[in-house]
């Protein structure tokens, strides 16, 4: 996938139970490939739930669950999103739909994102994967 990233905006809201609701807005120009994905690895005991994607038109993508098929064509992935569960975490995937300028908004919940110690609570996570 070749893309120019114009802007990335990430908002994180924590709840009283230690979960984090994450909203990532990706403003991109895409000229090849069939899908976009966000790698979320090394999560330990943190689980990922409630994944959703919308685009600049406001269209909500259809969630297909944890069995995302990477081998489908551009048109067969359009308007769809899903997960790939790996040993180290998750890949959050969605179809590009078409080439050109797009603004994708991906949202998800990280259950158990805030960890408790004896003297404090903490959140430590790499939000944008390298590469």
Predicted regions and their residues:
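Lumenal/extracellular ectodomains and adaptor appendage modules
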Residues: 1-131
